[in-house]
């Protein structure tokens, strides 16, 4: 049997009306600590639930993060190589610039020396001109001698001269052979005379 918000069942009575009229009334009765603990516990459970749900997502992103890290590493390596190449190029250009400056300074000193001592420079020019003239004369003499030699060689190489020289050589060879033959004959006659004289003496002695 129901009377208001109270149920009667035999001897027991169950009250079903609201325990507190408002939250303020409950706080006033139990204090803030109890309610605060419940609120914090609820919030902590929510945070843990979010972390649990987000863990698979983080694991799935691990390969992509590794790939990004490798790409960043490669980009950094290329950048360092480019910086090294640029540094070497700058060093080379600096050295070339220094050499250019030294060459300009040397030319400036040479020009200043010529302006300060024009007579010396003129004397050097005259000496160089004389040296060149002497060398030209020697080259001309050598060229003339070479030309004469070439003419002689050309003349000596003609077929007619070759035949004449060959005839002269043959004549000289014949004369030489004749002289050698006459000399041999004279030697033989002398030997015969020397060998015949004792024989004649022996022949005369046997007959007398």
From Swiss-Prot:
Superkingdom per UniProt: Eukaryota
Keywords in alphabetical order: Coiled coil
UniProt feature coiled coil, ranges: 78-113
Family: Belongs to the WEB family.
Name of the protein this chain belongs to: WEB family protein At2g17940
Organism: Arabidopsis thaliana (Mouse-ear cress)
Species classification: Eukaryota, Viridiplantae, Streptophyta, Embryophyta, Tracheophyta
